[in-house]
From Swiss-Prot:
Topology with respect to the bilayer: Single-pass type I membrane protein
Superkingdom of this protein's organism: Eukaryota
PANTHER family recorded: FAM187, IG-LIKE V-TYPE DOMAIN-CONTAINING PROTEIN FAM187A
CC annotations in GO: membrane
Family, as annotated: Belongs to the FAM187 family.
Gene field: Fam187a
Protein's UniProt name: Ig-like V-type domain-containing protein FAM187A
Native species: Mus musculus
Spans within the Extracellular topological domain: 19-377
């Protein structure tokens, strides 16, 4: 290719890049801000992370400030920014239950909230440090504590729609997740959130459909909350089977080294995924998390070669379960037993990514801590036992006093003493 052709191609490539940059910078110019501030309704499940883009802003504004209000017209407004519009927070460093002030991040004018909680429900405003608002969201974070699970393979149906006159309460499902395993039978699921349809909703809230908003939206009148509080979020599961993609095998040189070290020419056991070792004291609880997994991901667990399907191990399927998977994809083992020893494998989005080798010891010091759920349970049961004994003791003495006052109405206080 000649020098002239090369020059023309480079010039064309540079022009395309310049055009791309101009297009990205002109997004806010092509999106006019509403003359009357309205709220864009959005609903999420608890423990999920979500992003709120600032869809419009004046051209001369170089940094945005995000504000939060619990209710419209509230006198308390929380500022979610460092006033430079560039606050960054890593999702991996966010702990469950921490304050929203340490669970948000601002990237390219968008607000990111990690591990959202029902307390984060409210109104979010995109504006300037002077308090001028450009765009607003009505965010509804629905709790996952009373979530209802159904399994299509067992012919279980989701919750039926509810009608209260002009009010229509129903569930809107998200897309199915990918199959959580490959090469063997797996499971996929989707979650549904509570929505309602009502003709007399506030016009300041943008609806997904005509007169339809999430059940926790600020557009819902207070008198309707009693009808919607029992329509909880849902989880629906079904079986799936997909083939595994080809993955890079262990290099021959590494296998040759293993063969040399074994001395007998037989290769030692080579784990397919990284394995973490942990020893747990007998009788104490343990919670295992899948690395890099979030509640909306497809996560599966195996013990050695035995799959732990949610149809048998999902939290709430059986109240007496000692080993179960919660709605955040964590594996719980309560009151560890010797039979729990083994390797627990974690699948993420259909790929086996990690293993957890669990050993159970019967001796050794184990410092008690209030952060340990088993310790808290033991303390609660002990206090409850003392409370019941105290109530029983007081009840017996009250009965004795009542009986003596009826049988011997002329007894004196000295007689009782």
């Amino acid at each position: 290719m000649s020098l002239a052709h090369t020059t023309v191609l480079l010039w064309a490539w540079g022009s395309l890049q310049a055009f791309e940059i101009v297009e990205k910078e002109s997004v806010f110019q092509r999106t006019p801000c509403p003359a009357f501030l309205v709220f864009d309704n959005a609903a999420y499940l608890a423990d999920m992370s979500f992003e709120l883009p600032c869809h419009c802003k004046p051209e001369d504004v170089s940094a945005v400030v995000w504000y939060y209000q619990k209710h419209l017209g509230s006198k308390r407004t929380t500022v979610l920014t460092d006033f430079d519009g560039r606050l960054l927070t890593e999702a991996a460093h966010v702990r469950v239950g921490s304050s929203m002030l340490v669970r948000f991040s601002i990237r390219m004018f968008s607000l990111l909230v990690f591990r959202a909680q029902p307390e984060d429900t409210g109104l979010y405003f995109c504006g300037t440090r002077e308090g001028d608002y450009f765009y607003a969201y009505d965010v509804d974070i629905q709790s996952n504590k009373e979530i209802v699970a159904s399994f299509k393979d067992m012919a279980q149906e989701p919750l039926p729609d509810e009608y209260y006159g002009a009010l229509h309460v129903f569930t809107t499902f998200w897309e199915w997740t990918p199959c959580d395993r490959c090469g063997v039978r797996g499971e996929q699921w989707r979650f549904g959130l509570c929505y309602l349809q009502y003709p007399d909703l506030s016009p300041r809230y943008i609806k997904t459909r005509s007169a339809v908003v999430s059940c926790g939206s600020g557009a819902v009148p207070w008198k309707l909350h009693l009808q919607t509080k029992y329509h909880t979020p849902e989880l629906q599961f079904q079986s799936c089977l997909v083939s595994c993609q080809k993955r890079n095998k262990t290099r021959k040189g590494v296998l040759a080294i293993y063969s040399y070290v074994s001395k007998l020419g037989s290769r030692p056991w080579v784990p397919q995924v990284p394995i973490q070792f942990h020893q747990q004291r007998l009788g104490h609880g343990l919670i295992i998390s899948c690395p890099g997994a979030r509640p909306e991901h497809a996560v599966a667990w195996d013990k050695d070669n035995q799959p732990l399907y949610r149809a048998q191990y999902l939290k709430g399927v059986n109240r007496s379960m000692r080993v179960f998977i919660d709605h955040g994809n964590h594996l719980h083992i309560r009151f560890t037993q010797l039979s729990d020893r083994g390797i627990y494998y974690c699948w993420l989005q259909g790929l086996k990514i990690a293993g957890f080798r669990l050993g159970v010891i019967t001796r050794g010091r184990y410092p008690a801590s209030l952060s340990d759920p088993e310790t808290r349970t033991a303390i609660e049961l002990t206090l409850m036992g003392y409370l019941l004994i105290t109530i029983f003791f007081i009840t017996i003495h009250l009965c004795r006093c009542c009986c003596q006052s009826r049988c011997c109405p002329n007894f004196s206080a000295q007689t009782l003493l």
